[in-house]
A protein has these predicted regions:
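N-terminal interaction/assembly modules
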Residues: 1-121
Length: 121
């Protein structure tokens, strides 16, 4: 049995993949969510949290992007899509206050290690 905490970890991982697809294919987020529901990995995640992350990042994208641009020395266009996904998840979680900031930061570091490039941000 998968713990609720691990289900959220897996939801974030799948969300990074979905955000990567969203950035490259520019599909509506609800279509991407539907596509990911057929993934074998989807059965092990916190599906509600996965949908929460994606729909809120989509709805608040310009606000989140502006926050990231204001806090970074890099322009948005220089950040790789995988790293953008991780950062978007982190900023959304930090702004929403749904998790302790220590948890969010740790989870984003782990996502970066898992998905990011060796020289990731």
């Amino acid at each position: 049995m998968t713990s609720n905490i691990f289900k959220k970890v897996l939801a974030r991982r799948l969300a990074v993949q979905a955000l990567y697809q969203w950035q490259l294919n520019e599909q509506p987020i609800d279509k991407i969510i539907e596509e990911f529901k057929s993934s074998e990995l989807y059965t092990n995640i916190d599906a509600e949290y996965f949908a929460y992350l994606l729909t809120n990042i989509d709805a608040k994208f310009e606000e989140l992007k502006k926050t990231i641009e204001n806090a970074s020395d890099l322009s948005w266009n220089r950040i790789q899509p995988v790293e953008k996904g991780v950062i978007l998840i982190g900023v959304l979680e930090l702004q929403s206050g749904i998790l302790d900031h220590h948890i969010t930061i740790n989870e984003c570091v782990e996502l970066s290690k898992h998905f990011g490039s060796e020289d990731g941000y």
